[in-house]
A protein has these predicted regions:
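An acidic/histidine-cluster motif and surrounding catalytic segment
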Residues: 1-86, 93-126
């Protein structure tokens, strides 16, 4: 599924790493890197930023997904658990390529639109 998401974005040579964790594990990462002491559904750590950005040009970064949070949130999104995991993978990839939703409403709308379009495309093909 990750390869399919990347292909839909035209990133055929790109690589990501995916880590599936529980709420406690993602809370520790959220506190350490974003100073938010609570679990979240997905975290993205881009490799195209910082001192190691040129180390491996095809490596977009790391995506961490809390399976527990995904399960809890799936009903709110009208999805089954796998659908929610796919949505969070898309969300994480969009963050890795520069989309954001913090702050500006326009950025959040663009990201939500792109996320919805990608989700529809990749889930129609499976």
């Amino acid at each position: 599924m990750a390869r399919q998401i990347l292909a839909e974005l035209g990133l055929l040579d790109a690589e990501i790493s995916l880590l599936f964790v529980n709420d406690l594990q993602i809370q520790v990462l959220n506190q350490r890197y974003l100073l938010r002491d609570k679990p979240t559904n997905v975290l993205a750590f881009p490799m195209r930023e910082g001192e190691f950005s040129t180390l491996h040009p095809h490596l977009l970064g790391d995506i961490v997904i809390s399976v527990e949070t995904a399960k809890r949130q799936s009903n709110r999104f009208g999805l089954n658990e796998m659908g929610m995991i796919i949505l969070l993978m898309i969300h994480g990839v969009l963050h890795l390529i520069g989309f954001g939703h913090e702050g500006a409403k326009k950025g959040a709308r663009e990201m939500a639109t792109r996320q919805r379009e990608l989700f529809q495309r990749v889930t129609q093909e499976t």
